[in-house]
Amino acid sequence: MTHIINSLDEISHHYDALFVDLWGCVHNGIVAYTAAVEALIEYRKNGGKVVLVTNSPKPRIGVEKQLLHFNVPKICYDTVATSGDSARVAMFTGVVGKKIFFIGEPRDQLFFEPISIIKSPIKIEQVSIQNAEGIVCTGPFDGSADPSVNKEDFLFGISKSMKFLCANPDIVVDRGEVRHCLLYTSDAADEC
């Protein structure tokens, strides 16, 4: 029979560490869930470690700044692991080449700053789709635009067998209302 867990404190003593999804568990994209934050603070007071995980394309430091804006205090977690940092490791080790066509918003340029855990990161050059070896996507150019705006770029990339690195596998993001996100954009390529 399945045991229903009503609160973290019922089971937390069984674990040395928690890996907790951010979006929908700790915050809703606008504000923190107070009960979740309080539960994590209490868990840490009792010696537990908390790693917040997210498929945000942002580097850890960017997510930590965003968390403060959502009223998620640093005292409720030890560190943050992001898909953005994982994708940056892949990019700076050459997975998609050195000449990159970038799909994303200008605010995501921090993605292209070398990550400290890579000793000798390759030099990345952002180029047009015609001159690219690979495509890196942190999100649509415009989150409110129809995903088909990138269709021609995807078709060109497919025709040249370019590698595609998607830093955020979300199809949609819910911030009070649904809006397009990364994989919705790459799904446009699947339809081709």
Name each region found by the language model.
Residues 5-11, 118-133:
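Short acidic low-complexity segments
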Residues 126-146:
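Short, well-ordered secondary-structure micro-motifs within conserved domains or adaptor modules
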Residues 5-8, 26-52, 59-64, 81-89, ...:
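Short, acidic loop-to-helix structural element flanking the phosphoryl-transfer center
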Residues 1-20:
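Non-catalytic pre-domain segments flanking phosphatase-related domains
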Residues 174-183:
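Glycine- and acidic-residue-enriched helix-capping/strand-helix junction motifs
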Residues 44-122:
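Active-site phosphate-binding/coordination module
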